[in-house]
Amino acid sequence: SVEDILKGVKISGSIPMDGFFSELELGINFADRSKEKHQPEGNINVGIQGDTTIAPDLQYGNVNLGFAGLGSIPSWNVPGAVARYMTFDPSETSAGYLIAKAWTVKEKITTAYAKANIDSQVGSIPVRGNVGVQVQNTDQSSQANYFDGSAAPGKQVKPINDGTTYTDVLPALNLAFNLGGDQTVRFGLAQQIARPKVADLAASVDFGVDNTTGKPGAGGGNPKLDPWRANALDISYEKYFGNKAYVSAAAFYKDLKSYIYKQSRDNYDLSKYTPGSTATTNFGTFSAPFNGAGGTLSGMELAASLPLGMITSALSGFGVQASASFNNSNIAVKDPDSSSSVGSGAIELPGLSKTTSNLTFYYEAGGFEARISQRNR
């Protein structure tokens, strides 16, 4: 089972202004998130009565499965039969491998911001947008358990509590220039962050020993993960034709200060988990999300939308949308001893496609909508 609770409070206000800035917004936001996962497991065993005939009140009769070549087979109330004739006692701690499947992650994020909205002109060109700053404080923690094979029976399940706190100052500038003729140029400059996945912050550790080599290994989450951080530059051009048709081109550049990737570190000290196990050494492979530092991400995107009714009324309601993106990345792996590293050289960002394209044909009319899409990456 998974329980994910999010609570939030936001207080904000605005002050009208005259001149280049039309309004000043001030606010503070409190976000509290708690995610808890439990995955108890167990075997279903025959009860003390042993093998027996299922009672008539639990039988449904025969079902014809001739279409599958199985003929007629009996059917019954399976949940009822399990409850009456079998035992099932799921647990999170009955085996060492189950312990790492339960964890709790908590995040407390406080964000204060100030934003000045722009609705003015630069020369004869109308410009809209905003400039502002956010100050964000994050307190993240995780609680889980691990199996200590050296402890006395009944005391082998031990807690893990870990986490970190950090503060980010995030300035941003966003501008949109109206060039006339339904043309817009957008410009953005900002320091950005992206939070880690909640499951990546789990403190749980799954430990095991290779029976052939005696080498230990472990994997889990990392409650001390920093977010993705980047200095970002975005610029785009948009041209509209009527209400729905448009073409656009956008380019972006991100100077990555930190990123997150799954890494396997060799010769990792696992002495905390090896006592009582069959391991012949305390050092093995540990796999978990880690932060990398330094790199770039850049690219461009082309997009177009064309309602075919603009060509001929016979195709009214039909349309086509297309887009293509082209990406380049370059990161430096933090730990040269990791199996995902190439020494001091750079690698591409794992999981990022160099080229992605989308093509969609659609029909929209009278409240009815149908789409056929293709995506390549």
Set out the residue ranges of the language-model regions:
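Short loop/turn motifs that connect adjacent beta-strands in outer-membrane beta-barrel proteins
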Residues: 16-24, 39, 121-127, 180-182, ...
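Gram-negative outer-membrane beta-barrel transporters
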Residues: 253-255, 272-377
